[in-house]
Amino acid sequence: MLMRRKNIKIEFRYDGSSYYGFQRQPNKITVQGEIEKVLRIVTKEEINLISAGRTDRGVHANHQVSNFYTSSNIPIEKYKYLLTRALPNDIDILSVEEVDENFNARHNAKMREYIYIISWEKNPFEARYCKFVKEKIVAEKLEKIFSDFIGVHDFKNFRLSDCVSKVTVREIYQIEVKYFGENKIKIYIKGSAFLKSQVRIMVGTALEIYYGRLLENHIRLMLNDFTKEYKKNLVEAEGLYLNKIEY
């Protein structure tokens, strides 16, 4: 009997500290690889996740969305239990549902939000989850620097050299810098999509301007001048989180 092919959407979160990024890599432990491994065992099929975002090594996710196709007859309500039981504790399945066969977690996403956390109080138990700086950051001053990113721009200068994306134009919808407790800020960056390490280079560049190590117009130069190679000011991965996906 031929089983009907189903399109399954899963929403999940993870601590990226122990993984070589999200995307599957040969002989490396990745988030995608761990989930696909469990799904192959459960469904007895070859599974390929289609995902909204591909985070770097050490980057976390509060909300990630993937979908996959399967002809397995496993009841949809059992997937969450089976995945949760088999996956490591640093990957948490939030929901599993069957969706329209045309749904694509990557291409249908309308907005992706990242957050970056910075702390000026050193804490060894938070070393994997934020960036430490020596002095308090003035949120309003940093947010003003980030405003140059808002809108549609070519982010060719805000990606690593191994980025394979042919289209480098992206739209940034909103950037907010908010205090979080007494010793932290969270930088919220909303956009259509992002290039490899784009957010980390954006944050790193803004911080260099904030500390006076780059001129105030440096972001505008990088967004408009493609005649030379600019230094990539890349902040640590540990403070970055894929926070929200909207469709």
Swiss-Prot record:
SUPFAM superfamilies referenced in this protein's UniProt entry, alphabetically: Pseudouridine synthase
One Pfam family this sequence matches: PseudoU_synth_1
One example GO MF annotation: tRNA pseudouridine(38-40) synthase activity
Catalytic activity: uridine(38/39/40) in tRNA = pseudouridine(38/39/40) in tRNA
Enzyme Commission number, as recorded: 5.4.99.12
Record flagged with keyword Isomerase: yes
One of the GO biological process terms: tRNA pseudouridine synthesis
HAMAP family linked: TruA (MF_00171)
Quaternary structure and interacting proteins, as annotated: Homodimer.
Its job: Formation of pseudouridine at positions 38, 39 and 40 in the anticodon stem and loop of transfer RNAs.
Protein name: tRNA pseudouridine synthase A
Organism of derivation: Fusobacterium nucleatum subsp. nucleatum (strain ATCC 25586 / DSM 15643 / BCRC 10681 / CIP 101130 / JCM 8532 / KCTC 2640 / LMG 13131 / VPI 4355)
